[in-house]
């Protein structure tokens, strides 16, 4: 099961003047939903989308999703806004196979490497969260013990340096549905909403094992400000091609500093090495380096 709730209103994008649902904002040849879902291997997944009724009447979002992902996907329609991601996901309960694993993908992100769900399903954990390092209170967080087990999660509160990407794994669909209902019955809310990450605290109370898996590269575009930064500083300047670096011996230190900056911004690069020849033809040097990489 791969469950993708996109029933939120996206108020900040509406207020910023965007006319289409944020998942369908386009950057070049791709829409934001493409960028996010491309980070997850959806082959052999039971794809379930949760959308709002007005997204269908105003934007034909159901037809767009079927054009992208096939006629056999499941589209669950909400009559309006829900009380949060957990409530939205529970609308799809009858379509979730209770006996197989469930992944929830909340979009608005680009990360690497690509998630292969079969690999995660081979773990012994009852649940798993993808994480990245951060200290911003905009995100949810997982606190780990000395054996890398999650002992607590929190929404919009920094309790560790392990922020949640927005990919959530439950060992079975039943495990999610039963505990999601309990969360709502106990009225466990953050900012008056039912978020997914605090749901894991209920599983932890029951002595179930929750793990994390870190991603190497992470970009977020869940708010207009984050989207503009992504568009103008990641995609526009770099696109799909990595930066190539090379230097003579006098520029080694500068090159290494630049590599640290690129790494800190999760920007891909290729280090073509260093030449001892001050009069080097760099175009020829890089061509030879590329040829060597292709051959080897």
Residue positions per predicted region:
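Conserved N-terminal catalytic core of the sugar/cofactor nucleotidyltransferase
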Residues: 1-4, 12-14, 18-19, 25-26, ...
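Conserved alpha/beta core of the MobA/IspD/sugar-nucleotide pyrophosphorylase nucleotidyltransferase superfamily
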Residues: 2, 163-239
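N-terminal beta1-alpha1 ligand-phosphate binding loop
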Residues: 6-11, 241-261
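A short, conserved beta-strand element in the Rossmann-like catalytic core
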Residues: 55-56, 109-112
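Short beta-strand-to-loop acidic/aromatic patch adjacent to the donor-nucleotide binding site
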Residues: 99-110
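Conserved core of the sugar-phosphate nucleotidyltransferase
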Residues: 111-187
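A short beta-strand-loop structural module common to alpha/beta enzyme folds
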Residues: 268-280
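N-terminal small/polar loop signature for handling phosphorylated ligands or for N-terminal nucleophile
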Residues: 280-296
